[in-house]
Amino acid sequence: RTTYPDARVGVVDLEGRLVMPGIIDLHTHMRDPGLTHKEDFYTGSRACAKGGITTFFDMPNTQPPTVTAQALTEKIAQAARVSAVNFGFHFGASKNNNIDEIRRVIGSGQARSTKVFMNVSTGLMLIEDTALLAEIFKVGGLVFVHAEAEMIDKAIELNARYGNGLYICHISSEEEMRTVIKAKQNPALHNRQHPIYAEVTPHHLFLHTGMREASAEADMLLRMKPELKAQSDTAFLMQAIRDGYVDTIGTDHAPHTLDEKLAQLTFGIPGAETSLALMLAAAAKGNITLPLLQKLMSENPAAILGLTHKGVLAKGADADITVADTAVHWQLGRKDIVSKCGWSPFEGWNFIGKNYMTIVNGNIVYRDGRFAADLRERPAGRFVFQI
C-alpha cells in the first residue's frame, strides 16, 4: 500500500479483488449501422463496460456492410461519438471483389484484419470463389474467418499458401478443434509467417444442444452460427483451452430482440455482459486458472492485433483495467441487462464471480453496478488505431 497525501490523486481500494489488464473482445456485432434497434455503439459499449470489456472489435456484417473505406471511416466516427470503451474494426471482404478497398484500408492502418465468411451467417457476405479468397488472404492482413467443418481445412490451406495469419472464429466442435490442433502441431502450417489463432466463445463452452432441445422457446432462443453442439464437444473445447490450443475467448456478441428471436429463426445471442462472469465461474470450479483466463481475455488478444500498450499492467501501458470480485455469488436477472436487446440466454443462472470495476483510459466507467454519470456526454472510448 502507498499513501498519497496529494488530494488530486484518486485512490481506489481494491484489496481482495482480481485486478487484470482490461479485457479485449475481438469478436462483436454491435449492429451499427442499419440494425440499431438490436444494439448500437452506445448501448453495446455499455454492455461491454458492465462485463469488464475495455476494448471491443466490431465485425463488418452490418447494413450496409463495412466493405469500403468510406463505410469504415463512418463507423469509426460514430463509435468515437458515443462509445464507453475502446473500439476497433475488422474490415469486410466482399464476394463482389473489393480487393482494392482491402488494400487501401489495411495499408492505411485503419484496420489490421479482414473478416471472411466461408460459411453462411447473418448478412450476405459468403465468399465461395477460391481465386478471390486467395487474393484476400494475400492482402487482407490477419484474416478472421467464419469457417465451419471442412471450411476450416480450406482456410488453413489458404493461409499456408497465401496468408499472413489466420484467426479462426468461434470453433464449436471437437472435430473442428482436432483439425486446428493438428494444424497447430504442423510447423509447415503454423509458424511465425503463417500463424493460426483459435477462438472459442462462452456460449459454445457453457451451452449445448440438450439445453436448446429443452423447450420450443429454448429452441428459438439458443440458435446461432455456428450452432450449439453436444455436451461432449463443450468438454473437449474446455480441455483444449487447458492444453493451450485456444488463444482467445471472443463473445461473438450478436444481439437480436426477444421478439425477433421468438418470431422467426434468427441466429445470434448477446454475450458481452456475461463472458467474464462465465469464465470466472469456470475458474471457481477449477476448470481453468485465473492466469489462463487473463491470457485468453486480455494478453493474447492484445498481442494478436499488435496492441502493444494494452493487455498488460505496466508502466507506460494504457490505463485499461478490469477488476473482478472472484468470490461473490449472484444470479443474473433480466433487470440486470443493459444491452439494448434486453435479454440473455444466461438469465436465471447462478454465478461465482463478476466484474466489479471497468477502467478505460484512466476513467472509471463502471463500478459495482453503476455507470459513470457523464458517460453519454464524455465517452471514454478511443479508436485503437490512431492514424
Regions found by a protein language model. Give the residues of each.
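Divalent metal-binding segments
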Residues: 29-39, 54-69, 89-100, 117-126, ...
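Histidine-rich, glycine-flanked metal-binding segment
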Residues: 1-21
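C-terminal cap of metal-dependent C-N hydrolases
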Residues: 315-384
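His/Asp/Glu-enriched, well-ordered alpha-helical/loop segment
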Residues: 150-154, 158-163, 242-243, 247-249, ...
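Histidine/acidic residue-rich metal-binding segments in metalloenzymes
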Residues: 100-249
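Metal-associated gating/positioning segment near the N- to mid-region
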Residues: 14-82
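A glycine-rich helix N-cap at a beta->alpha junction
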Residues: 77-93
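Divalent metal-coordination and catalytic microenvironments
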Residues: 16, 27, 48, 52, ...
